């Protein structure tokens, strides 16, 4: 875009220098120069600069009382801090405060979205319901602070490289996280669940008094079904079976039953 002679006079600076003050990222984000003065309405652009700053640019059309076009006024505002606060609030609204996993509300919204995608032809997805074995014993023996450490430890495993980028782990209730595995068959989901189970079994957690604690978990596995209630019920049934057949194992749901 150009810089007017009036702008030079107002700020006492050569127009070439004025134009050079505008970051390249901003120039790249704006419409081509030939379009700027044919645009009939006000417009807003948001640009992320290389140094991490976010700038909002408002283009305001200036007209006379009779409606004649006088030009455009460009207003630039640093909104970096505002966007940072918004991201923080969004994270708090969707994250479990103890574990850092996705909270139930956000997780269920993602599950519903995945169900819709599958209904419209997307590949199948798998669903895991996890439950720490004898977790009450951990709380009773070492205290709730250590119990919280165990939950955080499991959450860290889930957030680590054991899951793929497209997978989502959430805390649905108490010591029962769940994992949504998009574009995943039940067979592939079983392999992922086993990898998670073994990783937890082979790890240790330090109690508040310095003792090393080992815990295991049971996993109920099912395909994502046509509605969330059926998906949760199916994975819960498989989890219940895993608990009642020795714990520390992965059980697939029998979805052939009516």
Task: Give the predicted meaning of each segment.
Residues 90-91, 104-124, 155-164, 182:
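Short regulatory alpha-helical coupling segments
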Residues 168-171:
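A short pre-motif secondary-structure segment
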Residues 117, 160-166, 198-212, 241:
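Short catalytic/binding micro-motifs of nucleotide second-messenger systems
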Residues 90-109, 130-144, 152:
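Conserved nucleotide-binding and Mg2+-coordinating catalytic segments in signaling enzymes
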Residues 1-40:
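PAS-family sensory domains
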Residues 62-96:
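Sensory coupling linkers of modular signal transduction proteins
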């Amino acid at each position: 875009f150009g810089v007017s002679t009036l702008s030079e006079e107002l700020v006492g600076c050569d127009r070439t220098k004025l134009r050079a003050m505008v970051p390249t990222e901003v120039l790249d984000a704006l419409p081509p120069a030939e379009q700027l003065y044919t645009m009939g309405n006000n417009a807003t652009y948001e640009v992320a600069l290389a140094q991490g700053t976010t700038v909002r640019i408002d283009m305001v059309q200036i007209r006379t009382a009779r409606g004649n076009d006088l030009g455009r006024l460009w207003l630039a505002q640093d909104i970096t801090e505002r966007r940072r606060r918004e991201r923080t609030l969004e994270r708090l609204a969707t994250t479990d405060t103890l574990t850092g996993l996705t909270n139930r509300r956000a997780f269920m919204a993602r599950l519903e979205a995945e169900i819709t995608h599958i209904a419209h032809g997307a590949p199948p997805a798998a669903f895991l319901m996890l439950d720490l074995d004898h977790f009450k014993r951990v709380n009773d023996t070492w205290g709730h602070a250590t119990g919280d450490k165990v939950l955080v430890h499991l959450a860290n495993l889930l957030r680590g490289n054991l899951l793929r980028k497209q997978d989502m782990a959430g805390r649905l209730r108490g010591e029962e996280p769940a994992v949504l595995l998009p574009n995943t068959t039940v067979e592939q989901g079983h392999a992922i669940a086993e990898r998670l189970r073994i990783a937890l079994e082979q790890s240790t957690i330090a109690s508040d008094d310095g003792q090393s604690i080992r815990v295991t978990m049971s996993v109920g596995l099912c395909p994502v079904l046509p509605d969330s209630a059926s998906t949760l019920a199916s994975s819960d049934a498989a989890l219940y079976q895993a608990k009642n057949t020795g714990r520390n194992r992965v059980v697939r749901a029998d979805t052939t039953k009516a």
